Amino acid sequence: MRKKKTEVYALRRHISLSADKARRVIDQIRGRSYEETLMILELMPYRACSPISKLVYSAAANANSNMGSNKANLVISNAEVNEGTTRKKFKPRARGHCYPIKRRTCHITIGVKDISLDDEYEQIYSLKKPRWKNKYTTMIYHDIDSIGRVWDKK
């Protein structure tokens, strides 16, 4: 008996971007839903967001065409960045010297999983909770003194 396939991948190779800079963005979207991932990538100010968002769109289109899954049920289950080839050039400098220039590339793989097809989703994967929510935060009013009077700077 074959197991039903619930995960689809999209791969992009030789992106002219450092692997460390791409990992900074990939770490933020791993484990999140498809719609939340697109919102995060739209609002992040990094250059790596554009090729990663195209890759997320491609993975969702692959899931839609291969499995017929709805985009609302997709979760980024696997996201990895590997180093690619490095192009080496030389920049001519004064007095016949030269400095090496390394143009680094990377390979990015995005895997999306359809949670409606997976029975064990609740046990294995859970959506990331926002880090900024803390149940112990309290509001501090700076314009009220310890007795409760309103403090005016005038």
From Swiss-Prot:
One Gene Ontology term from the biological process aspect of the record: translation
Keywords assigned: Chloroplast, Plastid, Ribonucleoprotein, Ribosomal protein, RNA-binding, rRNA-binding
Pfam (any one): Ribosomal_L22
Cellular location(s): Plastid, Chloroplast
SUPFAM superfamilies cross-referenced by the UniProt entry: Ribosomal protein L22
GO cellular component, one term: chloroplast
Molecular functions (GO terms): rRNA binding; structural constituent of ribosome
RNA-binding as UniProt keyword: yes
InterPro entries in the record: Ribosomal_uL22, Ribosomal_uL22_bac/chlpt-type, Ribosomal_uL22_bac/org-type, Ribosomal_uL22_sf
Oligomeric and partner information: Part of the 50S ribosomal subunit.
Function: This protein binds specifically to 23S rRNA.
Family to which the UniProt record says this protein belongs: Belongs to the universal ribosomal protein uL22 family.
Name assigned to this protein: Large ribosomal subunit protein uL22c
